[in-house]
């Protein structure tokens, strides 16, 4: 189960270090923070690494 509500609400706050909007990380203080990602990454069961302000196709760990 996805720990974020991004798939339902389009936004989430994954702890104090990362916020997501439209399933993209909008504020991240560390490289590994948010498990909600764009459609291209939604199949990655192990989560994503934020690249700047978004999670890109290389988010698979």
UniProtKB/Swiss-Prot annotation:
Binding site for a divalent metal cation 3: 14, 18, 23, 28
Keyword Metal-binding: yes
SUPFAM superfamilies according to UniProt: Metallothionein
UniProt: a divalent metal cation 2 binding residues: 6, 12, 14, 25
Any GO molecular function: metal ion binding
Binding locations of a divalent metal cation 1: 4, 6, 20, 23
Residues at which a divalent metal cation 7 binds: 50, 55, 59-60
Binding site residues for a divalent metal cation 5: 34, 36-37, 50
Region (Beta): 1-28
Region annotated Alpha, chain positions: 29-61
Protein family per UniProt: Belongs to the metallothionein superfamily. Type 1 family.
Entry protein name: Metallothionein
The gene coding this protein: mt
């Amino acid at each position: 189960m996805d720990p974020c509500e991004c798939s339902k609400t389009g936004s989430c706050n994954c702890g104090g270090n990362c916020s997501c909007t439209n399933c993209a990380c909008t504020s991240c203080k560390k490289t590994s923070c948010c498990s909600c990602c764009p459609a291209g990454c939604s199949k990655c069961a192990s989560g994503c690494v934020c690249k700047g302000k978004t999670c890109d196709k290389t988010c698979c760990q």
